[in-house]
Amino acid sequence: MASTIAVLGAGAWGTALASVLGRNGHAVRLWTREAEHAAAINAERVNQRHLPDCPLPDSLTATADLETALGGTDWLLIAVPSSAFRGLIERLAPYRPGKVVWATKGLESESGGFLHDVVQAGLDPAPAMAVISGPSFAAEVGQGLPTAITVAADDADLAAEVVRAFHNDRFRPYSSTDMTGVELGGAVKNVLAVATGASDGLGLGANARAALVTRGLAEISRLGAALGADPQTLIGLAGMGDLLLTCTDDQSRNRRFGFALGQGATVETALASVGSTVEGARTAAELHSLAERHSVEMPICNMVYRVVSGDTPLEQAVRELMERTPKAEFDD
């Protein structure tokens, strides 16, 4: 049965997900902050600014009016950067949405906590919640290339509803109840992609890249264990799957940012060269604090934090990583 769904955030990712829902026959309202942007999307039937190679289905309409976007919807999907997430939740509070789904990846910028905590604290009554994550570049989703993702929810009925809404012969969602693990994988992989990009920018080779991905997964797993995440989640699509994609393909903004650092660019110049949101640069500090609060050792992610914050030159950080005291590969 067709639903009416609000997608809040008309960047590349929000537009790609909205296009999947629209192609599946759902009525989609794509919200952007700018009336001019909404008018252009409606007139041109494409989001030229963020996803120019993705023609939009007729069932999708764009609007800059939040009340119009939300009115009469079955559920809403948030796809804004993590830095804008809390502000949007505050704007949603008067509307008291009953079902909130998000595809934002990262930790909350003010608290350094998980996005589900922001939703629970910011909306009263607390809605049914779900998060979408996994190996999924927006351009490929928009073009209809085969993609598999994870939908984690605190409510089995909402998980099933979101899975049904997205599922087609090119987009395969899997369900999960582990919201913490799915959110964690989506946040940490961005920081690790900065590390692998920097390694490749320095010309450190394929061996180093493989080591960073593998030991990076160990860091995600250690933090996940401390936070109560399901270990299987972290070797699934939202963990290892997204990590592999983001660390090895230049469609990743985080990887391109790290590569620019490895080539000698300053943080500011590297960010400018990417030209759009680099979640890993923002998440590094929040992840550093989160790991410290839980006494979890995350040397690669900590290296990224030190480099991005300007505390340590990249070459020195790499040397310190390699010179750490030898240890067993797996913790007891």
Curated annotation (Swiss-Prot):
NADPH binds at residues 13, 33, 105, 138, 253, 279. Pathway: Membrane lipid metabolism; glycerophospholipid metabolism. GO terms for cellular component: cytosol. The active site is at residue 189. GO terms for biological process: carbohydrate metabolic process; glycerol-3-phosphate biosynthetic process; glycerol-3-phosphate catabolic process; glycerophospholipid biosynthetic process. It is found in: Cytoplasm. Coiled coil: none annotated. Catalyzes the reduction of the glycolytic intermediate dihydroxyacetone phosphate (DHAP) to sn-glycerol 3-phosphate (G3P), the key precursor for phospholipid synthesis. Belongs to the NAD-dependent glycerol-3-phosphate dehydrogenase family. This is Glycerol-3-phosphate dehydrogenase [NAD(P)+]. It comes from Halorhodospira halophila (strain DSM 244 / SL1) (Ectothiorhodospira halophila (strain DSM 244 / SL1)). The lineage of its organism: Bacteria, Pseudomonadati, Pseudomonadota, Gammaproteobacteria, Chromatiales.
